[in-house]
Each structure stands twice: as structure tokens, then as C-alpha cells.
Design a protein with these regions (language model features):
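Juxta-kinase regulatory segment immediately upstream of eukaryotic protein kinase catalytic domains
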Residues: 1-24
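Conserved ATP-binding subdomain of kinase catalytic cores across diverse folds
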Residues: 22-150
Length: 150
């Protein structure tokens, strides 16, 4: 999804989040463009440009993501076992920013985190399955009406 306007978009991202970052691509970006933002060499945030060709309503998607993250962080059993990602609002308090045709959001960088593109052992499969089961269990009392924008 990368394009020639990426540099100017990343400059815009810095204005909305109010810091001077050095960006580097993060992951393979199968769906979204993802960047690690460092300040003074220290990883701080992860920025994502959501793919509007895949997600028809990126604002609704971000609203739903915020609802899910809030629910998971309030679930003691889940949040004691797993690090729940933290959405970082822009300077004006928005959960994401639409600029021209791109929607950007920011996450707090989770030190030591990794994303396996391919599972290479039965232990990794078992760990992923257990984590997914915990995720499903944490959603038992999640109410779908909260998915809609008010």
C-alpha cells in the first residue's frame, strides 16, 4: 500500500502527535502500512496507515478497535496474562486522524513484542491457540451494540 506521498504523510503524522520521530517500516504490511516511530533512538510508538481498500469505514473500525481494547483491559483475567495494546490519541484527543485519503492511528510500542509471520514449532501453535482461546473467553460478556458509532 506504500506510495510516493508517504514522506509528507509521515510529516503530517508528526504534527498530529506532536513529536519529532524517525520512522522505519515495521513488519510485512500485508494489509496496513506500519511504522515504528523512534525518538532519540528509543522505540516509542507504532503508527499504522489503515488500508481503506480493505476496510470500507476506517473510522468505524477504529471505534470498534477502541471498544475492544477497553473491554480487554478491564478483564482482569486477560489483562493479567497478556499486554493489552494501548491506543495513543492525537494531540486533539482523536483515536486516529484522517488526512486526505489516509487514516492514521498510533499505538504505544510494546517492548519485547514480536509477530511471527510463520509458525515454526508445535509450541508456537499451542501458544497461539491458548492465547486465542483466552481472547475468546474475554469476549464472552462483550456487547455487540457497542460496536456502532453513536
Amino acid at each position: 500500500m506504500t506510495d510516493k506521498n508517504l514522506g509528507s504523510e509521515l510529516n503530517m503524522v508528526q504534527r498530529f502527535w506532536g513529536r519529532d520521530y524517525v520512522f522505519s517500516p515495521l513488519g510485512d504490511g500485508h494489509v496496513n502500512d506500519t511504522f515504528l516511530a523512534r525518538q532519540k533512538g528509543v522505540p516509542e510508538l507504532v503508527f499504522q496507515r489503515l488500508n481503506g481498500n480493505v476496510f470500507e469505514n476506517v473510522v468505524l473500525l477504529q471505534h470498534q478497535t477502541a471498544q475492544l481494547v477497553t473491554h480487554l483491559s478491564r478483564d482482569a483475567n486477560f489483562s493479567e496474562r497478556f499486554v493489552v495494546p494501548e491506543i495513543v490519541p492525537s494531540l486533539n484527543g482523536e483515536m486516529g486522524v484522517m488526512h486526505e485519503d489516509s487514516y492514521w492511528r498510533a499505538w504505544r510500542f510494546i517492548e519485547g513484542s514480536l509477530c511471527n509471520e510463520r509458525l515454526e514449532s508445535i509450541e508456537q501453535v499451542e501458544t497461539a491457540a491458548e492465547a486465542f482461546g483466552c481472547f475468546q473467553r474475554a469476549l464472552i460478556d462483550f456487547h455487540p451494540e457497542s460496536w456502532q458509532l453513536q
